[in-house]
Amino acid sequence: MTRILKLSHLTPQQLNQLKRRSEQNIDQALAIAKEVIEQVKMEGDAGVLHYSRQFDFAGATAENLRVSEAEFAEAEKLVDPELRRAVEHAFRNIEKVHAGQMPPPMHLAEIEPGVFAGEKITPLPTVGLYVPRGKGAFPSMMLMLAVPARVAGVKKIVVCTPPDKEGKVEPVSLVTARMAGVDEVYKLGGVQALAAIAYGTKTVSKVDKLIGPCSIYGAAAKRLLSGIVDVGLPAGPSESIVLADETTDPKLAALDLLIEAEHGSDSAALLVTHSASLAEKALGYLGEYLEKLPPWRKKFCEDGLGSYGGILLTDSLQASLDFINDYAPEHLQVLTADPLKLVGKIDNAGEILLGNYTPSSAATYAIGVNAVLPTGGFARSYSAVSVFDFLKRSTLAYLTEEGFAGVKETVTTLADYEDFPAHALAIRERENLL
């Protein structure tokens, strides 16, 4: 049942539980994920197939784990033209947004006479993208991950996505993968998929980085694999905050609260407001809109709103903003009287969506901003997926003779103080050698 919680009445323990979302259950998931990872690490393909046959499809073999060219061709024939046009529209906007993020491949600046410093930007050689499916098909997620990787110039893009029980990958996702420049798609889900691309097997390519949203078990696996491969931003179960005030239409507040709530029973969706009247009205409309959803989506909403979300009533707009910055939501929708005025007061959110015409669903599919965002409070230190997740930076420096002369005394003084004689010797001897 959806709750109205009064922020000032919550005990420290209750507030902490609210801020932890479903991550409070991760300890059990860690034990399960560790067992799967160890088996894949030790047995390679055999370990992957053991779990794939249990959780993906019973007929999994080393030969059919990778999507074939024939399967890509078949998928092309199955996609409805209207759906293809929608995917192409989303692709264009996502590509434009991420192309605009690209830095120059190299820059050097003269910071004092003869002293040049800068960076060289290089794409990662290989990345593994995890595109979930458990609660539905997500071709949009394929775009959000693969397009910035391709724009960044990654040489090899590998995707793992769960198949259906017949061993088929959803056709729109395959068409989208080709559109976005994916090189390999494997019919793998869950912890076994992440372990396979982290360690590599005879069949599955090893990658330099893996990235993508996961269930709580996938989030646990990423923690365990973080010493083996770069696991990117923490992207677990969906979460959102809708910020409202007394001017907000309660129908919009109720509608937008359900957007992230329908992702799953482990999703955390909160309506945060200092208006008791708005809170009560929105709660009433929630029941009405829940009845418009399929039973299984309705249950996801009811479970998540009852366990990890609901309506949070604060004492003031400032108290709402303070809570938001502390909670650091994945998605933040601002439905207040003047949303632009509040942007400068919001420090911690994966995405900030402003105004009545910008629901989270529009950002998920069509605006072009990336919808793969940090969860679990990690928006305090992580950002949305971008081209920068697929690029690495090498510092670049060059000294002319004049520049060397200008810094040599500083270098030798500091090297002597820190007792690194070889550092200082490399400077002093150069005066005799050059």
From Swiss-Prot:
Output the InterPro entries linked to this UniProt entry. Ald_DH/histidinol_DH (IPR016161), Histidinol_DH_CS (IPR001692), Histidinol_DH_monofunct (IPR022695), Hstdl_DH (IPR012131)
**Residue ranges of the TM segments:** none
Which pathway, metabolic or otherwise, does it act in? Amino-acid biosynthesis; L-histidine biosynthesis; L-histidine from 5-phospho-alpha-D-ribose 1-diphosphate: step 9/9
Enumerate the residues binding Zn(2+).
Answer: 260, 263, 423
Q: What class of enzyme is it?
A: oxidoreductase
Q: Which domain of life does the UniProt lineage start with?
A: Bacteria
Q: Which GO terms describe its cellular component?
A: cytoplasm; cytosol
Q: Identify a single GO molecular function assigned to this protein.
A: metal ion binding
Look up the record and name the cofactor or cofactors this protein needs. Zn(2+)
Positions of disulphide bridges? none
Q: So what EC number does this one have?
A: 1.1.1.23
Keyword line: Amino-acid biosynthesis, Histidine biosynthesis, Metal-binding, NAD, Oxidoreductase, Zinc
Q: Name one Pfam family in it.
A: Histidinol_dh
Location of the active site? 330 (proton acceptor), 331 (proton acceptor)
Tell me how the cofactor is bound: Binds 1 zinc ion per subunit.
Q: Name one GO biological process term.
A: L-histidine biosynthetic process
**Per the record, what are the reactions this protein catalyses?**
L-histidinol + 2 NAD(+) + H2O = L-histidine + 2 NADH + 3 H(+)
- Mind telling me which PANTHER family this protein's record contains? HISTIDINE BIOSYNTHESIS TRIFUNCTIONAL PROTEIN, HISTIDINOL DEHYDROGENASE HDH
Q: What does the UniProt record say this protein does?
A: Catalyzes the sequential NAD-dependent oxidations of L-histidinol to L-histidinaldehyde and then to L-histidine.
Family membership: Belongs to the histidinol dehydrogenase family.
**Name this protein carries in UniProt:** Histidinol dehydrogenase
Please report the organism this UniProt entry assigns to the protein: Synechocystis sp. (strain ATCC 27184 / PCC 6803 / Kazusa)
Gene name of the record = hisD
